[in-house]
């Protein structure tokens, strides 16, 4: 019989509880400075002072503990003989003996290999059910000694951006599972050049990945790629935007519609008396650059229509790929033409563009609601130009997406198909308590 520490922990715990429940309790006596301690020349084995072994309360308690410990082997033997859950290791040869088949037959059944007769398979499966056999997925994966390649297809981005947080989380997940021979490949496409998306996807397939983390673009382009992934039986996880019709293994991200709805509600707590507010969008050729931003805007406008239909929403598009001077010129023109605007909602992680402009032009009467705890946004929040940020836990998304591929492909486990990130509101007062590594 093989004994584990986990087997005797409950017994030791029970014995210790009984000891400390005694009267007087040992813990209480240790805290008391004054207690009856007759000294007749015998050194106490517990307190290192002179005592009478027969009357010393410390020695009496230690004798009880020693007696309880001496009972542990007897209790273990009793539990083992009565089949009370001792964690004996079940070997393949034990299963084969119980089923009356060969070890090779059991191995083929466990690993779902062919060349096993129906009767032999039924015998083995019956024994597996009886003993509640559960294979050690981690041990099997380690023994397999196979190299796995996971590809992440993400938009190109500047340093300290939302997507960099996702990359850091993904790389951390691989680092923590390096014993399983995981490898990650980061591949990027340009949102300024949509044709690079399918080209990046094609190059990714040439690497023969075992799994893919994917940020969708248009439905048509994304579906063309995911259809090929299904044909090649390559699992994929979606980030940023959920497209259930594509049948991904899993999705990680916020409910964009609810996020926009929530943002409008929070903003109007401080802007309920305003006649108009500003909505800032990041666009390319006049269109928003992601379905996520599009859904946020839909949710935002839905709340405003339902609760503040009289408030005018003015829209300002900031084209992608422009420099700081170009953005500041657009913002200066807007605020010069609309001096009554005091509240702004940005649909992406670049709230710092507007926030930085407000700081440089000393406009202290405009409050911004934006997205993502990237460093530039956090700095604007600390300096007062951004009032609120909605955190998306980008680092956690990157980590969890790789973890989902690992659990499904390597450990052969089921994963949850939809995983919404919390909609967490940050302000100047709690921004320093936000931790990206909360996993």
Predicted regions mapped to residue ranges:
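Flexible loop/hinge segments that line or gate small-molecule binding clefts
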Residues: 220-258, 374-382
């Amino acid at each position: 019989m093989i004994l584990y520490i986990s087997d005797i922990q409950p017994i030791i715990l029970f014995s210790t509880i009984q000891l400390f429940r005694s009267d007087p309790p040992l813990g209480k006596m240790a805290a008391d400075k004054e207690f009856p301690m007759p000294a007749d020349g015998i050194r106490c084995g517990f307190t290192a002072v002179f005592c009478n072994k027969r009357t010393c309360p410390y020695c009496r308690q230690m004798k009880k503990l020693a007696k309880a410990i001496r009972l542990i082997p007897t209790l273990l033997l009793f539990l083992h003989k009565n089949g009370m859950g001792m964690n004996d290791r079940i070997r393949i040869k034990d299963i084969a003996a119980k089923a009356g088949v060969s070890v090779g037959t059991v191995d083929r059944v466990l690993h779902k290999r062919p060349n096993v007769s129906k009767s032999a398979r039924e015998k083995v499966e019956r024994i597996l059910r009886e003993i509640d056999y559960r294979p050690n997925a981690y041990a099997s994966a380690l023994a397999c000694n196979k190299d796995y390649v996971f590809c992440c297809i993400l938009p190109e981005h500047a340093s300290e951006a939302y997507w960099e947080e996702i990359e850091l989380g993904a790389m951390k997940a691989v680092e923590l599972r390096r014993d399983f021979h995981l490898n990650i490949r980061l591949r990027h496409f340009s949102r300024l050049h949509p044709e690079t998306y399918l080209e990046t996807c094609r190059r990714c397939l040439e690497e023969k990945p075992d799994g893919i983390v994917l940020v969708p673009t248009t439905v048509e382009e994304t579906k063309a790629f995911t259809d090929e992934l299904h044909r090649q039986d390559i699992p994929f996880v979606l980030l940023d935007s959920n497209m259930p019709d594509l049948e991904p293994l899993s999705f990680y991200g916020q409910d964009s519609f609810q996020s926009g709805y929530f943002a409008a509600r929070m903003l109007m707590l401080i802007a309920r008396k305003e006649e108009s507010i500003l909505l800032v969008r990041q666009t390319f050729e006049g269109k928003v650059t992601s379905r996520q931003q599009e859904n946020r805007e839909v949710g935002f406008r839905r709340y405003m229509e339902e609760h503040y239909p009289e408030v005018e929403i003015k829209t300002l598009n900031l084209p992608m790929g422009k420099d700081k001077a170009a953005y500041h010129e657009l913002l200066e023109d807007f605020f010069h033409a609309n001096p009554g605007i005091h509240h702004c909602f940005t649909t992406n992680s670049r709230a710092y563009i507007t926030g930085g402009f407000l700081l440089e032009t000393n406009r202290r009467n405009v409050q911004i609601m934006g997205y993502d705890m990237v460093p530039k946004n956090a700095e604007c929040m600390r300096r007062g130009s951004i009032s609120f940020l909605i955190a998306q836990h980008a680092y956690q998304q990157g980590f969890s997406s790789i973890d989902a591929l690992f659990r499904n492909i390597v450990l052969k486990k089921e994963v949850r198909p939809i995983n919404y990130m919390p909609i967490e509101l940050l302000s100047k007062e709690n921004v320093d308590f936000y931790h990206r590594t909360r996993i």
